[in-house]
Amino acid sequence: MSERQSPGFLDAVATAFLRRRLHSRRLRVAALRGLTTVSNGAGDGLQMDFDHAASCFAHATPWMAAHTKGLATAPVPPAEPPRVPPLSIVIMVIGSRGDIQPFIPIGRRLAERHRVRIATHREFRPMVERAGLEFYPLGGDPHEMMEYIVKTRGSIVPTRLGQLWEDVPKKRAMIAEILASTWRACTEPDPEGPEAQPFRADLIVANPPSYGHIHCAEALHTPLHMIFTMPWTATTAFPHPFARIDPGTYRPIENFFSYGIVDLLVWAGIGDLVDDFRTKTLNLSPITLADGASLLDDYEVPFTYLWPESLVPKPKEWGPHIDLANFIEYEQAHTYQPPQSLLDFLAAGEAPIYVGFGSVVAEDPAALTRTIFTALDKANARGIVSQGWAHLGNVAPPPNIYVIGDVPHDWLFARCRAVCHHGGAGTTSAGLRAGLPTVVVPFFGDQFFWGRVVADAGAGPEPIPIDRLTTEALTAAFDACRRQQVRERASELGGRLRAINGVELAVHSIERHLPAPAMYCSENPDHLAVLFCDRCGVRLCGRCSRLAHAGHVVHPYRYVDWGGGSPHGLVGELADLVGDAAQALHAGLAELVPSVTSSRDGVVFSDGESPSNADRGDPIRKLRRWLASW
């Protein structure tokens, strides 16, 4: 072990970190090396390696004790939402179909009192408009996004040569496109709509991967409310879904650290794009890496998570600005017309097991299909296999299997006896709400989190990661779904989930966190204030300004001040620790990408050193050498 990696060195780094005295860029990079590791094999990429830095976390134990001492032990009942004047609301969502669907019932409920626009990928326009909601196209191709995530196995920093050569530049271009489109979604008419109705957002609702949310809110001085289906707020209860560590494997302090590290590494890769967006499009000042990585936490932006308290309790660290709702089902059963062949298959025997991986892309669809078919046969089970984006079922199915395309989960799952899927939040919620035993085969990210939640709830067997999926493992999982204890637990859980109205809870959360009554017109509280009269010191809607305050000096009224914030708590300390290190990692990768673009077998390092022959064609080794050069 080198001097920089010795326990004594890590002790010194941890002590300096907690005292805000780690000023050396070289030491910060070394600290990042202590917290991460570059791995080969199916999990290529940058991963958390907390065992290597265990002594660092030992120094944080007193901080954690103080942090947890005063935490509330019981949830605080949420206040009633205030009376809210009609608003123009934009809901920005990036992701797959399952990511978009929960926002449609929320949007429809909000549209009873407000003007609502859902901004998402162009291919989801028909789904949004069928629900009677306005649409605006955001950038990015969800298919390409999913292919990238599957290739990298959800790695924060990809390191395979092909990824660095082709995928990283394409992903960065896609993020830049998404950022630019989020501002247009807040301020412009739908470019493809039948009527070019003006639009300016009074409230932004978004999921975290839409990137531009908080920056658009700052430029417009509007409230922001985040909604997501996976944990995105630091907690000691479980790790960040993209930290690539198994929930329950590490201590609370490591779980808490994982959120700050992931945020910093993500921002190291996109910070320059965000700053371009802020300065060139929004006319805002640039932000530092450490500040940008923690904006949502620093401003305590209201968050609603779409799962029930009974399944994943709200962590004690999460304050009153964070609410839990419930899974939200996008109901389609009442309009679905099934083909007769599907009805005949369902009527011909025992209820089948559903198998499908939704929007996940498979590297070898034929091999995966054969594994599924064989496991169903060995388990003496009938199956319905969904093709999805993985293109399953591309080989001739046996008589006990029916291959389907797009069928609504709420219709189909009511006719199945168990489900097997990738662990996406949408499919997980649909299966559990239907009261079905659930087998999760996670590929990346939050799918591992939901696989663990299902198993811990007793509603299914242990999850089977895709790189460990075998015919034997899948057969055993199908057999486990027949156990009476599993079936009873799944049925009980489904009944409890169906009894909670997640849409009402989510809308309640959005409205109660609005900065009312500061949004009201002082003279007509039923209208939104848009101007402020200096002479009278009152907030005004446009109508009152024209009638009663003609000739007065009025200014645009800003009911949210996104003034400067600063990192705080352990995440803030972590920003001080590895902010420069993450930026240095980004700079190193930025140098690595153009060099492999011009030469497949060589990398020009920052000091001009040429790689050894042993490094040629091996980006993992190149990245290790780059980190070691610090």
Regions found by a protein language model. Give the residues of each.
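Nucleotide-sugar-dependent glycosyltransferase catalytic domains
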Residues: S2-L71, R122-P352, F357-R382, G393-A396, ...
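Nucleotide-activated donor-dependent transferases that construct or modify glycoconjugates
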Residues: P81-S96
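A short, glycine/small-residue-rich beta-strand->loop->alpha-helix junction that serves as a flexible
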Residues: V93-I104, V361-A362
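A donor-sugar binding/catalytic signature common to diverse glycosyltransferases
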Residues: D99, I404-V453
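Nucleotide-activated donor-binding/catalytic signature segment of Leloir-type glycosyltransferases, i.e.
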Residues: N380, A390-P408
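Cys/His-rich, Zn2+-coordinating zinc-finger modules
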Residues: M519, D526, R539-G579, A584
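Canonical RING-type zinc finger of E3 ubiquitin-protein ligases
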Residues: P525-C536
